[in-house]
Amino acid sequence: MKELVLFANLQLFSADVNPINVTTQDSMSPTMKTFYDTALLENAREQMVFTQFGMKQPMHGNKVEWRKFNTFEKALTPLTEGVIPTGKTFGMTKIEATTTQHGDFVAVSDRLELESYDDVIFGATEEMGATEGETYDTLTRNILVAGNSVAYAGEKTSRDALTNTDILTPDMVNKAQTWLKKNKAPKINGSYVAIIHPSVAYDLRNSDEWKEYHKYNDVAPIFKGEIGELHGVRFVESNEAKIWKDGDTCVYATLFLGKDAFGVLDPEGEGMEMIVKTREQAGGPLNQFSTIGYKFCHGAKILYQERLLRVESGSSYGSLDEAN
């Protein structure tokens, strides 16, 4: 019944809201505002697969800033009695990213609120929260897939050379984690992490090595979206893992990460805002609609190129998926 009502009144979600100056008092109580803010943030947080692994910092002005400390060389030269060694100079590098602002809203008519059996405002808030989280995470992903370090499946040397048969294999996973180890990338809770598309995960989970490992190892998930582990890498699934498409061939990016490979503006600080306008505030002279929207600032930056490896591959689903 709910779907029929919503379908019949689909036009009542129209975003053609005419701007009008309305003088009102805020009729939403602080308790209700907190309720809707919490609902939006919880739904947004569930969609943030990439963002969960970033070094989070608050915003300062229109920028977000991270500091990474310089490493030291080994002290292999023996000390000389009575001679003070030269020592090292401690330093750090400041990395900045300019933030961008994003947002959207939906208008809900008074008739839809009256005719629906459900809490339309809360339902719209949940959907807006999910969309906000997906948007935030996609912005983060777009920065990460532009990293300098890339490897290609199937012994190929470029994205253009990849085909749908060049799937991600256990051997490629082993090579990726070896690359991170050789670059001394610290682990995240004892493991490296790979963010993988479900289509690529399907091929990997069909491999004998994956099946054999999980036959004898019960791996408890510790990350949002985690589906399993192989060669010391915990795999986290996301529909937003990057896909490029050319004709019937899709190329998928699987991101292998070490700790603090990138930084991101903390979405739970100044990053996100839920905005609900009641009919009295936004509905014009006849209080005909309310609005539900979100607004956030986003900023992200790769901090350590040597802790982030993008592995591009095909998938047996390559002819069916679309670019994202």
What are the residue ranges of the model-derived segments?
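N-terminal "assembly arms/tails" that initiate or stabilize quaternary assembly
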Residues: K2-T98
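Sequence/fold signature of self-assembling virion shell proteins
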Residues: L12-Q47, A161-K175, N206-N324
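Short, low-complexity, charged/polar segments at coil/turn and helix-coil boundaries
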Residues: T38-A75, I167-N217
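Short, solvent-exposed loop/turn segments at the edges of secondary structure
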Residues: G61, T99-Q101, N189, N287
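Hydrophobic alpha-helical segments involved in membrane association or supramolecular assembly
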Residues: W66, E126, G190, A194, ...
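Structured loops at beta-to-helix junctions and adjacent beta-edge loops in soluble globular domains
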Residues: R67-N70, S109, H197-S199, S238, ...
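Short acidic, glycine/tyrosine-flanked loop/strand segments centered on an H-E-D-like triad
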Residues: T89-S116
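Alpha-helical scaffold segments that mediate packing/assembly in large oligomeric complexes
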Residues: R111-N183, R310, Y317-N324
